[in-house]
């Protein structure tokens, strides 16, 4: 088992790597969802996001192809893929503050194609998650998570 200082060092290392390609975080709508348009086709968007996650040393947990699941149920759905990933030394701190925060961790990043054929990414704003779960003692960690997701999504929002 790692000591708390080792966890902190791991979290700081991930943030340092992430901030090297940092761009300002996007703002969420009233529903707490941040939506960002990708400049790449869906397959390349997913590949770029996964590569950026790996390059930052963040743990990639799963890729759920929702349109494939829908097809298996006889339902037509435009391309829609859910990526889950995270940095346990950072993310689990939120759950220690409120176990219900486990509903929002690991991080979920949706990549989908709109009716117009545009590719979008969407994720839940971390400030909104903090308010949802009444977590007030992890401000620095929520800021860090916001900076990390902004860095990851910047891999697909500009060429």
Regions found by a protein language model. Name each.
Residues 50, 54-107, 111:
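Compact, glycine-rich, soluble single-domain proteins
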Residues 43-46, 50, 67, 146-153:
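Extracytoplasmic/secreted envelope proteins and their assembly/folding machinery
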Residues 38-46, 63, 135-142, 146:
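Solvent-exposed, acidic/flexible segments
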Residues 108-135:
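Beta-strand/loop substructures that line and gate deep hydrophobic ligand-binding cavities in soluble
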Residues 18-23:
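N-terminal signal peptide c-region/cleavage motif recognized by signal peptidases
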Residues 1-11:
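Bacterial N-terminal signal peptides that target proteins for export
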